[in-house]
């Protein structure tokens, strides 16, 4: 039983799949970093407000400078995430294009083999022969319909009538002579009935 599970077919992972996975992992890490920076910016803004309220203007100003720098990092992170996502889309689309190209390649090979069996010259020859056959039959039809005279038509009708009559004629009587003896049953049937004598 263990061998059955050990021999389970493994899915094929290509280099493109690995690249896409790595890019998505980097994108996710950048998004986590963005989330962390955003929360930190919110805390620093609240802290700067508190420092101003306490009269510590210089410290608040220094904190806002740090906040501004982090905002610039956040903007760069957005650009990096966009680049990663675009790269993922490009790779995935390239994989689709490769499959399409492979399909076209197989189709072209199939067409080449078909063309080797049936060349253009062969197709033209068959079409010419077909057209010649149609033209020949048309000429025969024209000859049959146009060259017959009225006498020919009458002779054809007479022959057709004669053939029809032959099919309708009754079969001839048998040529063998009839038997001389009457069958026994027929003789009994024809035997005269006895006459009854009247009482005196």
Swiss-Prot record:
Quaternary structure annotation from Swiss-Prot or TrEMBL: Probable core component of the endosomal sorting required for transport complex III (ESCRT-III). ESCRT-III components are thought to multimerize to form a flat lattice on the perimeter membrane of the endosome.
Residue span of motif Type-2 MIT-interacting motif: 168-179
Record organism: Xenopus laevis
Keyword set includes Nucleotidyltransferase: no
GO biological processes: late endosome to vacuole transport via multivesicular body sorting pathway; protein transport; vesicle budding from membrane
InterPro entries associated with the record: Snf7_fam
Region described as Disordered: spans on this chain: 166-200
Coiled-coil ranges (or none): 9-102
Similarity comment: family membership: Belongs to the SNF7 family.
Membrane topology: Lipid-anchor
Swiss-Prot/TrEMBL keywords: Coiled coil, Endosome, Lipoprotein, Membrane, Myristate, Protein transport, Transport
Subcellular location: Endomembrane system; Late endosome membrane
Protein name, per record: Charged multivesicular body protein 6-A
Residue positions of covalent lipid attachment, annotated as N-myristoyl glycine: 2
Function: Probable core component of the endosomal sorting required for transport complex III (ESCRT-III) which is involved in multivesicular bodies (MVBs) formation and sorting of endosomal cargo proteins into MVBs. MVBs contain intraluminal vesicles (ILVs) that are generated by invagination and scission from the limiting membrane of the endosome and mostly are delivered to lysosomes enabling degradation of membrane proteins, such as stimulated growth factor receptors, lysosomal enzymes and lipids.
Chief location of this protein within or outside the cell: membrane
GO CC annotation: ESCRT III complex; late endosome membrane; multivesicular body
């Amino acid at each position: 039983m263990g061998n059955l599970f050990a021999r389970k077919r493994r899915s094929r992972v290509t280099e493109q799949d690995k690249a896409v996975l790595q890019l998505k992992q980097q994108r996710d890490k950048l998004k986590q970093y963005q989330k962390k920076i955003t929360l930190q910016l919110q805390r620093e803004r609240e802290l700067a407000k508190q420092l101003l309220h306490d009269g510590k203007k210089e410290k608040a100003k220094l904190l806002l400078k740090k906040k501004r720098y982090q905002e610039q990092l956040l903007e760069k992170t957005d650009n990096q995430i966009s680049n990663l996502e675009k790269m993922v889309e490009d790779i995935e689309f390239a994989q689709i294009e490769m499959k399409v190209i492979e399909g076209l390649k197989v189709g072209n090979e199939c067409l080449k083999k078909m063309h080797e069996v049936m060349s253009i010259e062969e197709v033209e020859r068959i079409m010419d022969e077909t057209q010649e056959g149609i033209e020949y039959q048309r000429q025969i039809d024209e000859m049959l319909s146009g060259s017959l005279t009225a006498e020919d038509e009458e002779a054809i009708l007479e022959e057709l009538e004669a053939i029809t009559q032959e099919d309708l004629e009754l079969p001839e009587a048998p040529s063998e002579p009839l038997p001389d003896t009457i069958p026994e049953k027929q003789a009994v049937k024809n035997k005269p009935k006895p006459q009854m004598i009247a009482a005196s």
